């Protein structure tokens, strides 16, 4: 079955550009992430991202945090 990818990123997680490259082979239709700084929930969305863009966003905003990451697979 076709499915999106949902990742629970922990403070110890370390996703790499190579991992994102693998993820977007089948799930490259969109990216979303959400995390809290204790005061506010932050979100980010990208359409048709490259692995390089995802790695940059991950390293700047998500790495070292509890976060939810969603990689979309178009199903229609």
List each model region and its residues.
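Extreme N-terminus nucleophile/cap motif
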Residues: 1-53, 67
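Short acidic (Asp/Glu) patches
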Residues: 46-57, 61, 69-76
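Short beta-strand or tight-loop elements
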Residues: 64
């Amino acid at each position: 079955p076709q499915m999106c990818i949902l990742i629970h990123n922990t403070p110890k997680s370390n996703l790499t550009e190579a991992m994102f490259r693998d993820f977007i082979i089948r799930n490259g239709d969109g990216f979303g992430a959400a995390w809290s700084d204790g005061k506010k929930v932050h979100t980010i969305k990208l359409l048709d991202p490259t692995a390089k863009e995802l790695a940059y966003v991950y390293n700047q905003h998500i790495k070292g945090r509890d976060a939810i990451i969603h990689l979309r697979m178009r199903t229609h």
